Swiss-Prot record:
Family annotation (InterPro entries): Peptidase_C15 (IPR000816), Peptidase_C15-like (IPR016125), Peptidase_C15-like_sf (IPR036440), PGP-I_bact-type (IPR029762), PGPEP1_Cys_AS (IPR033694), PGPEP1_Glu_AS (IPR033693)
One GO location term (cellular component): cytosol
Species in which this protein is naturally found: Streptococcus pyogenes serotype M1
Protein family according to the UniProt entry: Belongs to the peptidase C15 family.
Protein name, as recorded: Pyrrolidone-carboxylate peptidase
Length: 215
């Protein structure tokens, strides 16, 4: 099994991005699967262009995109990506699309095809906080998740794809009182646990357990 893992460069005035720092620490093999980690720019279309190049060349069995969600208290596999860019802040090249479809020929939304409930369970088993998230936002993270699912549907129809947000690293909250953060090694362990579940459930349906929210 081959798994493509992506991490964004820093954005929004941050000097580092825990997504990129964490994937740099991943081993080359997890649970027998070959892991390829790539950096993607926090730029709307360019992030998808880089992803497409690697999907076409690597032909992965699964794509896991990782992104920073400052303020979240644990690792959060995303349930759905919507066909809409609505940027609260500009991306790293100054693009700020508002109410713009990501793909004119794409679906209104794509649900993650990764075993998100099993991923949460595996992260919990590693002793780390995790939960299913029902919104990936409308910035570059949602954009890349949507593009990943669109591209896999077009170029690797038997592959799975999805996205997981992670919290700030400790170093990022020194001047942000009362903001949640995690140690980088723990973030990396959580990603490894999620990948272990992706491999473990490659030929099985996801766990049937509560992961929803009331609001």
């Amino acid at each position: 099994m081959k798994i493509l893992v992506t991490g964004f460069d820093p954005f929004g005035g941050e000097a580092i991005n825990p997504a990129l720092e964490a994937i740099k620490k991943l081993p080359a093999t997890i649970h027998g699967a070959e892991i390829k980690c790539i950096e993607v720019p926090t730029v709307f279309q360019k992030s998808a262009d880089v992803l497409q190049q690697h999907i076409e060349s690597f032909q992965p069995d699964a794509v896991l995109c990782i992104g920073q969600a400052g303020g979240r208290t644990g690792l959060t596999p995303e349930r759905v990506a919507i066909n809409q860019d609505d940027a609260r802040i500009p991306d790293n090249e100054g693009n700020q699309p508002i109410d713009t479809p990501i793909r004119a020929d794409g679906k209104a939304a794509y649900f993650s095809t990764l075993p998100i409930k099993a991923m949460v369970a595996a992260i919990h088993q590693a002793g780390l906080p995790a939960s299913v998230s029902n919104t990936a936002g409308t910035f570059v993270c949602n954009h890349l998740m949507y593009q990943a699912l669109y591209l896999v549907d077009k170029y690797c129809p038997n592959a799975k794809a999805g996205f997981m947000h992670i919290p700030f690293m400790m170093e990022q909250v020194v001047d942000k009182p009362n903001t949640a953060a995690m140690n980088l090694d723990d973030i990396t362990r959580g990603i490894e646990a999620a990948i272990f579940a992706i491999v473990d459930f490659k030929d099985r349906s996801d766990l049937k357990r509560v992961g929803g929210a009331t609001h």
